[in-house]
Curated annotation (Swiss-Prot):
This is ABC transporter A family member 2. The gene is abcA2. ATP 2 binds at G1331, L1332, N1333, G1334, A1335, G1336, K1337, T1338. Residues 484-717, 1293-1528 form the ABC transporter domain. It is found in: Membrane. The keyword rRNA processing does not apply.
Amino acid sequence: MGEFKSQLRTLLKKNLLLKGKSKCAICCEILFPIIVILVIFAILVLVMAFKANYDPYNASNFVNRFENTVLLYGNADGALNVEQLGVMNILKNEVATAKNLNSTQIDQLFIEINDQTAMEAFFQNKSDFVFSAVWFNNSALSSGTNPFQYNIRVDSDDVMDTEELIKEDDTSDSEVYVKKRFVATQVAMDQAIFSYFGLNKTLNVKGQRYPDPWTELWQKWIQGRDGIFKDAGSVFITAALMIFGFRLITDLVIEKETKIRESMKMMGLNDLAYFISWMITSLVTALPVNLIISIILKGSSVIHHTNWGVVIFTLILYLLTLLLLAFILSMFFDKSKFCGLLSFVIIIAINIGGIFVAKYDFAPGAKLFLCLISPIAIACSIFAMSARDLEEINTYNWDMMVTENQVIGMLVLDIFFYIFLVWYLDNVVTTEFGTKQKWYFLFTKKYWFPKKCNENGDEQDIESTYQNEDVEMTPVGVGQKVTISIRNLRKEYNTGDGLRVAVNDLYLDMYENQIHALLGPNGSGKSTTIGMMTGLTPPTNGNAFVHGYGILNQMSSVRKHLGVCPQTDIIWQQLTVLDHLKIYASLKGVSPSEIQREAEKMAVEVDLGEKIHSQAGSLSGGQKRKLCLGIAFIGRSDVIFLDEVSSGMDPLSRRVVWDFLLKYKKGRTIILTTHYLEEADYLGDRIAIISHGKLRCDGSSLYLKNKFGCGYLLTCSKILSSMNNFNAQQVTEFIHNYIPEATILSNAGTELSYRLPTASLPHFAQFFREFDDRLQSFGLLTYGISVTTLEEVFLSLGREAALEKGGFNIDQNENQDLEQLRKSIAISSTGVKAGQQFKGLLIKRIKTSIKDAKSFFLTLVIPLVFIIGSIIMYKAMDKPQIFYNNATVPLTMNLGIYSGLENNFVPMQSSNELNWENSLNSSPYFNKFRFIPQTENFEDYLIEGKTNGSFAYKSSAGAINFTLPIDVSSTTIDYTAFYNKDYIHSLPVHINLVNDAVLRKHNNIGIQVTNMPFKHVLSNFDLASEGMNISSIVYFIIIMMAGYALMAGSFAGNVAQERTNRVKRLLYISGCKKYVYWLSNLVWDYFFSFILILLTTCILAGIRENYKSQFGLMFLCLILFCVSVVPLSYLLSYRFASFGKATGAITAIHFAIGIIFVIISLNLRIQVLIDQDVDFQKAADAVDIVFCILSPLFAYSRILFLVSEFPGSVRVGTLKVDNYWSMDYGGSPMIILAAHCIVWVSWIMILDYTPELIGKIRNPKNIEAPPPPDDEDSDVTAERTRLLSVGPNDEPLQFRNLHKLFPAVGKAAPKAAVYNSTLSIPKGQTFGLLGLNGAGKTTTIAMLCGDIVPSSGEVTINGHDLITDRGQALRSNGLCPQFDALITLLSAREQLTLYCAIKGVPEDKVKEVVEAFIKMMDLGAIANSNTGGYSGGNKRKTSLSIAMLGNPSIVSLDEPSTGCDAVVRKYIWNVVSELAKDKVIILTSHSMAEVEALCYRMTIMRDGKMKCLGSIQHIKSKFGAGYTFDVKFKKEYLDSGIQTVLKAIPNSIVLDEHDVMASFEIPNPPDNPVKISTLFESLSHLTILDDYNVSQTSLESVFLKLTGASYEDRLNLNNQKHTSD
């Protein structure tokens, strides 16, 4: 439990550190959910009832409003009767008096039309000038039984629908009567009627809406809650909270993708601690945000009746289930490319489905079962919470619903269910990495009750049947403990080309206190074996045991012993060195009190003491490997797997690692894979060689040399200048004259080696004497002799394996291969052809698209689903929308129309109840009146009536409040008519109710007013929208925009990925024309776009006539949109480093900007249509043009709205589009779209051609470089003087005063990566560029390839200035970069074919060249497999092949053999040697043997400066002297052996000593190498030595002297120690 707590604490710290490094992500996590909730909150605010009380409107304002209009009147009988005429005259006189008009003028305003048809016609023609009309149906006079009748006529859209009485929606409100002209006419007519019948009282009438009954805050949300939150609330909540799931799943999959999690598991990670740590990390920000969301929803009373605890608890439980779902979904992703986006979409889609589960009635049990899916559960919960708050207006069948309490129970159950799923799926889901259980594992006894395997008996049985004569069966030493037993381990892969056996029944034992080196060619199965041993890869068959625990079923026990340094770096870029070591120390069980000390100690031990607080991302490649080494060793690990731990390290760093391994091997079993055979020989107590997945041999280095080597190894170095005329046969014949049994081993590059049998030792003296004399005549520079080396053993076994398998053999077909190589190299580029490049690049895009199904799905299928979905929705929403009231059925405005309502009464209030009753008791509806005492506030009564049993608010159409008493003496009838908005005719009804009652009381004559609407005169908007569904058009276009935005975003992802992976850089350096690169991408993406365009336009043409008639416009618009948005997306991709981020962000950018602009534009256009304002239209046009310039998606939407005939698309004063192509309509957006294409493509070209442009504007050669260093080597100075004095010459590569200063980053000072270097390399020379990691080698190559612009200085390639004539300078360049820039979705064959096209290899020769390189590089077995699955060595071979294609004159090889085995490395040397005959080769390498084999001239860089310059022999002579010899003593003779050697060879110096190894230097050699060899042979006969090697002072010694002060310190320390002895 203590270990669990410690791990949990460490993982939490790790996660929080990672989280804290991304401030932007934290801000998004906090702000995004709150913004999402605020969005729905804003929507709810828009529809809420803002006021509990509403202001009264004056209804007695006819005279004031009667301006510049006319009033029509007439009688159906052809003339008005005396009463009607009298009333109208009174009304006329009132207007005339108020406005001071004469009779003629007033007659022009009151027009009598006694023909209904004529009146209708007049209104239709001049509706804008008609205030209202009064129509009398007959000429009958009024009486007690026949009220005064009149009809008020206004536009049907200015009154409510006369065919309905009650309408409960937000748009229905009796207020329209008072806002428009109906009530004003009604009150004016009633006033005139009063006057005509002698009632001289002035009507002062107001209309006022009922006070909102929902006075409390929670009630104000009713409309939004019912229409929006009840259904969509859960979607917004899910979207808000899923941001944490998005971040979590992305982090989880990234750790899986980079193998970090599995590496942690290998070293003791507790899965429970891992998951809990991520859960807690997510909750650190998620819980506070979740609480804020709860406070917003509950505190604002959007959720009211549900108590605080339920709301908060529900959201917390739901958040937990979302995070657990993120864990579950992460199991099914191996790549982080789309995991977050797809998971987000999946969860939202499920939640939307949950809305329908919540809404529709079906078995509650089934609903509860579906609530096992938590997004469905939250939909049911939000629906239930909203329903409780809506019970006052809606009725719900709770028997068919899931309550919020039930949902809480289900969410709790969900949590336990999801935890089980996380555990189960983590054990059984097969992914790219990790060993998984059988699906039924939880039902097996061995899972719950594991037993430690008793392997000994099993081993005896297996061992008795295992026979391999090339295995040293007895361990070295006495009493060695077997810690690892591998038994018939097998791994098979189905590659698509058949079954490939990676590991073939491997049988091997490894021992404690030993380093067991695991060697083999690339692809031999070394890394696969380690993967199976550590649980990274499940075995197909067999088993292995670590301390007795089997890897098949007891991997968790195995991993408690493991420390692993895999081939790839398992680091977090943002964490420091110390952070890493502390994390892994805790995982391995180091006590908390010791973690800090152990981590600091380990950092110093792996030579990272000065970098302990530096972020891992800032470390060099070698330093990252050291960090991984420290991670493997820290803590309790006693079984260490090191997979190419020193790969990419310089010699000094490699020696540090060697010292470390020898120091820490005690008590441990170390399994080491390496391609440096001297490293295996130096470190390995036992060495196993695997070939084609099968164990070839195993034993100590001495055993293998005795078994597979014989005698001595003579290694000669050729004079580079005589390479073309070198005759190896001549040397061989000379050797055979003295030693007939000598055999040639290797003739690669400048190296020539022979095996000399032991029996030939007596002939050595005479042979070497003659050989020394003829060395120069043979074209040889130096030679050395040693006993059989491990490399010879490796090469020998490699030949045997090749013969057995019929595979690659460097020697068997040497002449044939070299001849084929010469032919292939001789096929030169015939000149870069844009057409050929374009074809190759287009084929690249086609093949990568076909192979990347997910990208294809995202690029084409999902956008197509969006587009087709939008079209289906558009078609489904086919019913035309009517935005006006067109009902013309007459409706009498009296209370009788609402008489059917139960408990309906009219509340009335007056200052005098008796007076009130006496004044209104003549009304036929008097029994419906109810007096409200003056002591009670009338409006409060109406408000409280919602819960008052005596007053049913919903059943009350209106109320009357008299502000003055009604009596005989009063001259004014002053009252307010309150109306219930749901009773849509309430206001005129209640005004008539009072006026009718008052007149009846006066002279027993009533008033009957009828609403008789005119047929609606269509407005411009009505005309424009007639017959269409505007909502469907808007939704259709918005969804269509989303589809095309996603398409554009996905196109950008590919470009971002190629830029980040440096594929584009290599293409450019290889000669790809920049415009061709972009053209190929554009054409392919345009092709995809064309598919969508064709489908879209054809489908639209089939469903709508307007789309069919404007097919050409639509088609061209989409074409122009795509040709403009694709390059814009490319441009935006420069801000993003990965496919997923680029796709998601750019899609959001396009869509968000487009939608915002569309909303603004539509509102402006509709307002223009309504106002018919030309100036406003010009302003809207200007806004649209600006929006079109800023967003191609908006420009496309403008055409869509135009063709869809959206209201407002037409010009002011017109009803139809006369010419869709005119500048007023489609012309301007189309021209702007075309301009977009030109602008964005030009912008991209400018960005890409910036180096060339800089060269024209600011040539670095005109900028003065800093002065040369004071301590500059004389040879470097001589080269500088020579070049600067003679000026340009015919040497292919020259650079003068080359300097690169990188600006300061943060607090760091500016760094001079390359310091004022001058150099010229002649044709036919291989130049070595050496130095420690970070010395400036790669920066130099990058400047020579044009990838980095120098700060100062000039580079000339084949006479062309790299800055001012970049294209010609780089025309014949080849580059093998340090990090493979391969297209992972293409095979080696496909990549070579592509680069043949890029480099201009004749098309009829491409296949021949490609097949030759595949054969020579031994890639035949995997040539059709994607390079993403290649081993590191095979990737290097592919990269080298690309560099050599097209016979370039200058080839830069940046560590070309890193990760390659000895066989392949030798072959690469042959290739490079062949290239060097007529080319310039620039080579960087950390292998000194490689440099000696290949390079004629070299320099060693330190801190960006060249520390030496010249031939290898010159540098050796200048900085080293005499001979060096390395010996391996028998263990018991280490100390005495060193003293023996020092006494036997005077003046010898101890250079280095490690364990049983020692290196000596003889500054003043006593004699030639044969004498020294004779001396060591005699020592070996005395059983002091196991092995030795004699040679001239090694280049590595010189390298260490020139690059490392620590080397000199150690040299002095060694010699002081042995001198004192």
